[in-house]
């Protein structure tokens, strides 16, 4: 499959300008934020961030205090960002990076300063992704990367010292198509993940049934002209035609990776070692042919895997992970609200929270540590069009 580099612009002049202008630029671009509560975190409390679609009443990104002992959420603040459908906090929790998912020139990556104690946001700046519909975003602390679904690309943004984003230094464009003429008419990048060892980046291409592999340059940052990503060997791993790779996750021990395929509704298990994937199993998560499988996560103890399905029989498929070989056994299915696009498990493993986009609610489920099964505790968090949940301990 042909792959081309659209641009490679190193932006020292832009960086200098950002340093000179500093907060004045940020204050000009900052949008309204509402402060609801000012208390800091206490024992068992997590800071929870929620990204939304803003076509309705939602304003953008919301912060909550979530108690992982009793499953209760308290609202803190919000910031107006358009269509922040995916977001990621920095490792220290001081910054949040979020996409603005649009199929036009509004497609962007946004940088925000975040006050963890108060739960408040301050927009630093936004940079165009150069690819439409950015739907996934990650950071290694030096760079931010977006997956641009309709743009058939991934974009790399160096991070300035103040946490803001410089213009894209690399935009990697992908070509090709798949057997599903309606959904795989071209490349569709849906997810990017850094491997547990921090050495590689994998990019899921729903349109071509591939996982692209890149070697990460840990030295690449604003101080040099080194590329963050270099094509790996092999350049990509191919999965069964028509699968539609969507999201990838890794086992806590780093030895296995699991891929949820949107179109086939299957989960593929891989052995992972030294940057290489070896397929070992394919198992159904969606048994009704909905072509809407979405998200995938593993419990903190590494014993259970969960995968969400949309469009028909909306819910979460539950699998036990064999401790010796990483193979999956399906053990249950939990029906949820409508369109469970995203979900997350608390760090202590007690709760699983589901962002049900079309039910306008985040559902809270208690997780049985022995069976992996879920029980709705009826502590719904009402919010318009929730599509991404992240925790900051």
Regions found by a protein language model. Give the residues of each.
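Bacterial Sec-dependent N-terminal signal peptides
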Residues: 1-42
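Blade-loop segments of beta-propeller domains
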Residues: 75-141
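Short loop/turn segments immediately following beta-strands, especially the blade-tip
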Residues: 65-70, 112-119, 157-166, 215-227, ...
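Short loop/turn segments immediately following the C-termini of beta-strands
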Residues: 53-55, 101-103, 149-151, 159, ...
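Loop/turn-rich, solvent-exposed surfaces of beta-rich toroidal or solenoidal domains
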Residues: 293-325, 333, 337-345, 352-354
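A short beta-strand motif characteristic of beta-propeller blades
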Residues: 74-79, 122-127, 176-182, 232-238, ...
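Beta-rich, blade/repeat-based domains predominating
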Residues: 57, 81-91, 130-143, 175-196, ...
